[in-house]
């Protein structure tokens, strides 16, 4: 698979305009990226812009801190799906991961995943690895699998750092099933993206997709 097919072309700035979202969608179609990842308020716009193409629409749930209660995350997910989202990146309750509260974490993931799967959509669970040690990452991997999420994702882009090679290796150490991995946060070059793919990532989240593709052209 070519590099472009791994990229979730991302625009999650709170100041992002509708014109910028439409440009994001045009770029995604031109470079044949896997998806556009936009804020919930822009899902319907993006869905209309990429309708009839292979580009999927991704949005975020409980973003960026994961501190929404489960009922709110479920409502967000339902609205995004109704607006045309095909993929949802949900921030887990990081405080509950750190506290080891398995039932709470698994139940929340399972509830959002069930809504997604009922509509033929996929869910990626953001665990914010910058805030976790290896023990917490192992716990998060177990919860993501138990909740039947499709992906585990490293980062929101709002913590002190994005995903690292060590994070990916840690995911691979503790994931036991078919859960896929998405790397994100600070991926700005072609070499970085390719390295994460070599490590086993199935998706790359980046707002620098065009620059990464143009790097090849130059």
Swiss-Prot record:
InterPro entries: Aldolase_TIM (IPR013785), DeoC (IPR011343), DeoC/FbaB/LacD_aldolase (IPR002915), DeoC_typeI (IPR028581). It holds the Pfam family DeoC. It comes from Treponema pallidum (strain Nichols). Belongs to the DeoC/FbaB aldolase family. DeoC type 1 subfamily. This is Deoxyribose-phosphate aldolase. The keyword Lyase applies. HAMAP family: DeoC_type1. GO terms for biological process: 2-deoxyribose 1-phosphate catabolic process; carbohydrate catabolic process; deoxyribonucleotide catabolic process. Pathway: Carbohydrate degradation; 2-deoxy-D-ribose 1-phosphate degradation; D-glyceraldehyde 3-phosphate and acetaldehyde from 2-deoxy-alpha-D-ribose 1-phosphate: step 2/2. One of its GO terms (cellular component) is cytoplasm. The keyword Transcription regulation does not apply. The active site is at residues 89, 153, 182. Its EC number is 4.1.2.4. GO terms for molecular function: deoxyribose-phosphate aldolase activity. Catalyzes a reversible aldol reaction between acetaldehyde and D-glyceraldehyde 3-phosphate to generate 2-deoxy-D-ribose 5-phosphate.
């Amino acid at each position: 698979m070519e590099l472009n097919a791994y990229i979730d072309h991302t625009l999650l700035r709170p100041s992002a305009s509708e014109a910028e979202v439409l440009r994001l969608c045009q770029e995604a179609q031109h470079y044949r990226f896997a998806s556009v990842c936009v804020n919930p308020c822009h899902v319907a716009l993006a869905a209309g812009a990429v309708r009839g193409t292979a580009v999927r629409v991704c949005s975020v749930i409980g973003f960026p801190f994961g501190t929404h209660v489960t009922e709110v995350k479920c409502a967000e997910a339902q609205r995004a799906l109704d607006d045309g989202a095909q993929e949802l990146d949900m921030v887990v309750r990081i405080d509950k991961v750190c506290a080891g509260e398995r039932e709470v974490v698994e139940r929340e993931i399972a509830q959002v995943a069930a809504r997604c799967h009922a509509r033929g959509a996929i869910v990626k669970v953001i665990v914010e690895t910058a805030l976790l040690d290896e023990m917490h990452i192992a716990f998060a991997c177990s919860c993501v699998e138990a909740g039947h999420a499709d992906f585990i994702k490293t980062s929101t882009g709002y913590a002190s750092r994005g995903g690292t090679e060590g994070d990916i290796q840690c995911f691979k150490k503790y994931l036991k099933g078919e859960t896929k991995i998405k790397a994100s946060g600070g991926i700005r070059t072609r070499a970085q993206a390719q390295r994460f793919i070599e490590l086993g990532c199935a998706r790359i989240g980046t707002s620098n997709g065009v620059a990464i593709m143009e790097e090849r052209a130059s």
